[in-house]
């Protein structure tokens, strides 16, 4: 049997540069690979792969769990003007979340933490 290390999302983008700026400048990921039409960003041993989107791509969703969603929100709220966002709120299933549409993609990013 093998040991799974982690799973990385592959996000199709209509503009790799703008999507990359979101991960670098807002979420503080570091670009670790760039072939011109395929990039990889990394933070705390998590990676996100960004590639060119095809014409008929469907909606995607990813969940990023953080230690403090309110501190995360305070860090990014002034950097995300113009993006589709839902500010921090509590879900019935015990998570406090922020929702952000990743620029130039059809991807919704959930950022959350467990609440007691």
Q: Residue ranges of each PLM-predicted region?
A:
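Vicinal oxygen chelate
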Residues: 16, 63-108, 115
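Amphipathic alpha-helical segments
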Residues: 15-30
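N-terminal beta-strand motif that seeds the catalytic metal site of vicinal oxygen chelate
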Residues: 1-18, 60-62, 115-116
């Amino acid at each position: 049997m093998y040991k799974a290390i982690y799973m990385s999302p592959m996000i199709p983008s209509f503009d790799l540069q703008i999507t990359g700026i979101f991960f670098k400048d807002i979420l503080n990921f570091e670009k670790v690979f760039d072939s011109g039409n395929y990039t990889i960003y990394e933070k705390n041993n998590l990676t996100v792969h960004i590639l060119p989107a095809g014409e008929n791509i469907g909606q995607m969703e990813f969940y990023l769990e953080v230690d403090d969603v309110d501190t995360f929100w305070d860090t990014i709220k002034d950097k995300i003007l113009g993006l589709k966002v839902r500010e921090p709120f509590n879900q019935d299933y015990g998570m406090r979340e922020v929702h952000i549409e990743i620029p130039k993609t059809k991807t919704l990013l959930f950022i959350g933490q467990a609440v007691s």
